Design a protein with these regions (language model features):
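PAPS-dependent sulfotransferase catalytic core
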Residues: 37-152, 167, 171, 181-202, ...
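The conserved 3'-phosphoadenosine-5'-phosphosulfate
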Residues: 40-45, 236, 240-327, 342-354
């Protein structure tokens, strides 16, 4: 498209098209034909299926684009931190803890998905950049303000790493890992408690052992239980887009048992002023995890849907998942060593028991 080099200027270089057509007709045997725009688009995307979906970039990265962008919009309203999950690893708790920090500002809540925007991994992406920006408050000239977003479905989204990097190449990425077996069981119990008919009609063991000839609804639930726990596979996808120095891999078990220590380490990674979370978090024996300390020295905990106590996983499922994740856990351990990151205790335990 010859007009692309003029994007942001005041002309489309139509004369260039005319000159090319005249040259081809005069000096070549190429036969030119025309077609309606929709037919041309279909032919183009048959040749370039990788371009079928848009890939949003930051308009402020190019001075020409910035000049034609609305003056009512801000270049600093995009997040600099992404909490990517996966689901059922403690991402909502981390979101809450991060929002306590005076430097960090979360996205505004979505009317349908609450604190998660889920922009990069579903049809919200097709709503465009303006839709995304509307969930972030302007900085109001405060250069110390850092925006962040949390969507736990980002971790294992096939298109997410590339889309995120195209728009937020300098962002810092936070992933939370717990035992993949516990994560799978927690997800099953989570949707079961929300009345999911598949989870209510099939046992956990039936779900995780379903083969590819099983009904689609059963295979879909199996995949949502098992696939996000293949941690090394998805981390490699993120590492293909982002530098390892931009990715923080957080131990979800420690986040639950020693949140203040985890937040201290995380603050160093984010390079933000230190905040003593020992004074902000207190263990609540009724909930079974740490909660925010309020001004009257009481605790403010997450909602009833968080921290539920489920029946223990049955022994048959435990053994199956231990075998199932052995290869993936081994790959994760090697990846962490390669990156110079600590191997969490839960991973050491699972490998020794495998």
């Amino acid at each position: 498209m010859t007009h692309m080099s003029n994007y942001g200027n005041d002309r489309l270089a139509l004369y260039t098209f005319e000159s090319v057509v005249k040259f081809l007709r005069c000096w070549t045997n190429v036969r030119l034909a025309s077609a309606p725009p929709l037919a041309l688009a279909e032919k183009y995307f048959q040749l370039r299926p990788d371009e079928l979906n848009p890939l949003w970039g930051n308009p402020c990265d190019d001075i020409r684009h910035r000049r034609i962008w609305s003056k009512s919009k801000w270049c600093d309203t995009l997040p600099k931190i992404l909490v990517i999950g996966p689901q059922k690893t403690g991402s909502t708790a981390l979101y809450t803890f991060l929002a306590m920090h005076p430097t960090l500002v979360p996205n505004l809540p979505s009317p349908t998905t609450y604190e998660e925007l889920q922009f990069f991994n579903n049809n919200n992406y097709l709503k465009g950049l303006d839709w995304y920006l509307n969930f972030f408050p302007p900085s109001q000239g405060n250069s110390t303000q850092i925006l962040f977003e949390k969507s736990a479905t980002y971790f294992d989204g096939d298109l997410v790493p590339r889309r995120a990097h195209a728009l937020l190449p300098n962002a810092k990425i936070i992933a939370i890992l717990i035992s993949p077996s516990k994560r799978a069981y927690s997800w099953y119990q989570h949707i079961r408690s929300h009345g999911d008919p598949v989870a209510n009609n099939y046992t956990f063991y039936t779900v995780i052992t379903a083969n590819d000839s099983a009904p689609k609804h059963l295979r879909d639930l199996r995949n949502r239980c098992l696939n996000p726990g293949k941690y090394s596979h998805y981390l490699e996808r993120w590492l293909a887009e982002y530098s390892s120095h931009q990715i923080h891999i957080l131990d979800g078990s420690l986040l639950r048992s020693e949140p203040a220590a985890v937040m201290n380490t995380l603050q160093k990674f984010l390079k933000i002023p230190h905040l003593d979370y020992n004074k902000l978090l207190k263990y609540d024996p009724k909930k079974g995890f740490f909660c925010q300390v309020t001004s009257n020295e009481k605790t403010k905990c997450l909602g009833k849907s968080k921290g539920r106590v489920y029946p223990p996983m049955d022994e048959v499922s435990t053994k199956f998942l231990r075998r199932y994740y052995t290869q993936h856990n081994t790959a994760l351990s090697k990846l962490l060593v390669r990156l110079g990151r600590p191997v969490p205790q839960w991973l050491k335990d699972e490998l020794s028991n495998g």
